[in-house]
Amino acid sequence: MLRGALKLAIVAYAAVILGFVWLTKDLTFATLARDPLFATYSIAVVLYVLGRFVVALFYRSVPDRGFRPTVSIIIPAFNEEDGIIGTIASCLAVDYPASRLQVIAVDDGSSDRTWERIQEAKQRWPQLYAVTLGRNYGKRGAMAEGIRRATGEILVFVDSDSYLDADAVVNLVQPFADRRVGAVVGHADVRNSGVNWLTKMQQVRYFSAFRVIKGTESLLSGTVTCASGCCAAYRRRVVLPLLEGWEFQTFLGRPATFGDDRALTNRILTGHRVVYQASARAETVAPERLRVFFRQQLRWKKSWLRESMQVLRYFWRKNPAAAVFTYASIAFPFMAPWVVLHAVAGRLLGGEPGGLWFYVVGTYAMALLYSLFYAFKRQDGLWFHGMTFVALYMSVLVFQTYWGILTMRDTRWGTRASTVEHARIDQGLVVALPPDVRRPPQAMGARFGRPDDYQHGRREGESAAADHAPVLER
């Protein structure tokens, strides 16, 4: 009954849009004819959005065919004392063969009681592999340490404020039965979606970003451009050769300290497929305050800008349709601020008001399309909150592209140093890492720009007892 009503609503929506165009055709076409650049942008955006929806309608998750590789779940954590035990518990409670599952919690030198909480979890669940880096190296350093400790064929990353569904891992690994797949991203919902209007809006946006955008990218020859850290899996043998370049990535002469997931995905995409698995679900905590939300969006925008430069170099060799969608998704954020300013300036200077009106109504129409799609898939009453995104987009977010460029060298969030090889200290016993993941410090420093305290890493062949790296394992 409800689904029928939603289908009717979507049909009615299409009728309203067509009616709007017909009734205002003189104004609309006159406005577009006088401004060919605005017309080109408007038509391109409509085709882009509708094209994604059409492709996404054909998306289906890979079914469970009994594929059960060994899995290592890695949880990098920094100052998450309130939620880390819940995250660990959700990872240990997944419906997956215990003999084929490893869970690793890495404390990135937290200044609160995160390490104590991890130790409490270790006492409750002895199978947990617990590591602390002693001081803050940044998320990428914690992820890299987890990779070095992992033994599974598949590496699953879970953010320390995220929670896996019971069947998430089983579903997440199924696409890896295809040897061409190097990474898989699951679906994330907002755990705190009921807190306020901002979290409700983000729930609708998250759903659209995963189900529509990643769903489309996945169908187009496995070209998902970001395996989000709240629930993502990688083939270990594919990651290890890329580990050095990713961990010590620099940009504009500085260490890359955010966008870790997008950067790793970018490297995987050069030789393998990255797909979306909607049936592998997780929940993550979203910002509840506008200030935090805007900072998060700016970080994401900066990493998107950095990695898009790499995408431009090779994506044309991927699926042609995927390349068109991807290059368009890069071009539009650069064009949008000028379109907004052009429309507003034209109205303020006494020009034809149709441009501004057409842009605002068109943007709301696209937002309504996403919201109705959410309503069709999720009957939780939150669909209308997707419309509030338009106001934030046109007033703030649309201009973040250029602000991100101007502040690109500001890497204060997640600043880190790193070592290549840490010693494992357990009750006074120091044990070297497995030799297959060891890297000579000289080579890494020379190629990728070694941080000063990288010198503390142990050189190939040195005595482990002489190493004083700040890594504890319990």
State the predicted function of each range.
Residues 19-57, 62-66, 326-411:
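Membrane-embedded multi-pass helical conduit in multi-pass membrane proteins
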Residues 72-86, 396-406, 422-441:
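Cytosolic juxtamembrane regulatory segments of multi-pass membrane proteins
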Residues 5, 436, 440-451:
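Short helical patches
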Residues 65-315, 446, 450-451, 458-464, ...:
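Non-transmembrane catalytic domains and loops of membrane-associated enzymes and transporters
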Residues 1-10:
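N-terminal membrane topogenic signal
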